[in-house]
Amino acid sequence: MEKIIIDENQFLRTISRISHEIIEKHQRLDNIVIVGIKRRGAEIAELIKKKIADLANVELPSIDLDITFYRDDLEYAEPDSKSPTYSGASSFISIHNKEVILVDDVLYTGRTIRAALDALVDFGRAAKIELVIFVDRGHRELPIRADYVGKNVPTSRSEEVQVRTLKFDNCYEVALLSPTK
């Protein structure tokens, strides 16, 4: 069973709110790099980057980060699935002494964020890393928390949260999928 929990209007308002929060929290924006975790986290990061540009008239540098080989669950991949390929980052931007805004779509166990933090080390030593999560669904296995949250959605472990974006799904919405009985 599927339930839409964030429609397109709510989705875009959430992007706007998170962007405002980032601007309000940072006195200077010229030391910020936005890093989006591929795939949907990168698209959400791009939306936030564009909104900040509209609001503050500043173009922030950004990176689309592939964390494939930093994950700790590759051995659990389906035996019939293709071998993972690493596409790296969209560009190399040093994050040394920069404030990094790390963006992902869903925060669940925390393992994706741990992998992203490991991957970021290859880009330098950040002055600070803050986390933007579009949907926090709970069930953490690691001590990870977001600095900016679009929406908290309590779920059961059997449910799935899907953040849908224009680039990958031809729409902006968030769906909660429950197993059929």
From Swiss-Prot:
Pfam families: Pribosyltran. Keywords: Glycosyltransferase, Transcription, Transcription regulation, Transferase. It catalyses: UMP + diphosphate = 5-phospho-alpha-D-ribose 1-diphosphate + uracil. The keyword Transcription applies. Its EC number is 2.4.2.9. One of its GO terms (biological process) is regulation of DNA-templated transcription. It comes from the Bacteria. It is an enzyme of class 2 (transferase). Substrate binds at R39, R40, D104, D105, V106, L107, Y108, T109, G110, R111, T112, R137, V161. The keyword Transcription regulation applies. Belongs to the purine/pyrimidine phosphoribosyltransferase family. PyrR subfamily. NCBIfam families: PRK05205.1-5. This is Bifunctional protein PyrR. It comes from Pasteurella multocida (strain Pm70).
